Amino acid sequence: MLIFTFIGINLMSVAQETQLSTIASNGWANNSVNTVIFRKNSLISFNDSQYAAYYDQEQNVVLAKRKIGSTSWTLVTTPYKGDATDAHKSISIMVDGDGFLHIAWGQHNNNLNYAKSVSAGSLTLGNKETMLSAKENKVSYPEFYKLANDDLLFFYRDGGSGNGNLMINRYSLKTKKWTRRQDGMIDGEGQRNAYWQVAVDQVGTIHLSWVWRESPDVASNHDLCYAKSTDGGLTWLKSTDEKYSLPITAANAEYALKIPQKSELINQTSMFADAKGKVFIAGYWRDARETIPQYHLVFKTDNHWEVSKLNFRKTAFSLSGGGTKQIPISRPQIIVWPNGKHYAVGLLFRDAERGNKVSIALNDQLGSANWKVKDLTQNSIGDWEPSYDTELWKSKGILSLFLQHVTQVDGEGKANQPPTVVQALDWKPKNK
C-alpha cells in the first residue's frame, strides 16, 4: 500500500486518485464549527475553480479559491466575523450559474448574515444583504443548493428548536432577486419541529427527508420522513408521486421508517439522489433490543423503503441533552454511483473506535452485506464531521472533503486549542 505524507494529516491511498492540499494553517479549532455536517457547502466548485470558506483563529470569515486539481490556494480574509464559539454558526457557500459566490454565516436564532461576491469569480464580498427582510431575524442552519437551471435555493429554520419552521427561498439568475418558495411547509403544530437534510439531483428534483424532534433534547428525535419537489419547491410529492396537501404534519407525512424516541437517532445527517431520482439517506440510531448505535442507509426500491445496517460498531453511547454534543462518531455523509447493474455506495464518517480518522465504508453492491471500511487518513481528525463539494461529485465524480482537526466540548463548550491546518482531500473511487 502506498503511503503519502503531507503537512498536517497523513494520507493513505485507497483509490486511483488521491490528493491532499493545504488551504491554510490558521483554522479556528476550539469547537467543530468549521466541520459540522450541515455546511452546505464548505467547498464548492464552478467551472474550473473550487472555493472554500472557514473561520480563522480570530473568528474572521476567510474565503479561498483554487483551480480544480491544483494544490495552491488564494486566500482573502473578509471584513466579516462570526461568533465561532457557537458550533451551530457555521459558514455555507454556493456559486450561482453566473459565477457569483453566495455566503451565509454565523446563524443560530439570529438576524440573517448573507452576502455575495462583487463580481463573478471574485473572493471580495459586497455589503451584507437581506433576502426578503421578513422572517430573517431568527435564522438557523442556512443551506444553499443549486437547481438544474443554475438558480439557487436557500433553506433555513425560522425560530427555535422545538418550534421552528422550514423556510425555502429561491434566487433567480434572471432577476438577481430572492423570492419565497415555502414558509413553514413542514408544520410541527407547536409540538415538534423537523430537522432536515436535502439533496438536489441532476435533473433538478429536490429531495427532502427529516426526523421529528419533540423538544430541545436530542433524545426526542424520532422517525424518518420524506418529500420531493419537481418544480423548484412549489409543490411537494411523496415518493409514490402522490401530491402533499401542505403543510406537511406528523399525520400526513410519508414515513420512510418509524424509529422511536430514545433510540440514539441523530438529526441532520445526509442524503444523496442520483440522476434517476433514486434516493439514499444515511443516519445512525440504535435498533430496538440492541445497545450499540449503528450507521444505517435507507433507500427506496421499486415500491418500498429498505434499510441496510452497517453492523461494524462495538461501542455503546447515549444521545441526550441540548447544545452541540461531543459524540464518539460523526454524522455520516453518503455518496452513491452506478456500478454495472448495481449501486456502489460510500459512507463517510469518523469514529473513536478507529482512532477518529477520516474513514469510508464502501460497498460495491448496495443491499449486500459486502461492506469494507478503509481509513483515508492515518492521524486523528478530532471531532471532525464530513462535508464535501456536492457539485464536483456530480460533475466529475471526485469526492472533495473539507478537513480540519477540531475539538468539540460537550454541551456547546469551547476548548482551548491553537489553530489547526485547514485542508481539502480529493478522492476518487476505483470503480467510478
Predicted segments, located by residue:
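Extracellular, repeat-based ectodomains that mediate carbohydrate processing or recognition
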Residues: Q16-K432
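Bacterial Sec-dependent N-terminal signal peptides
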Residues: M1-E17
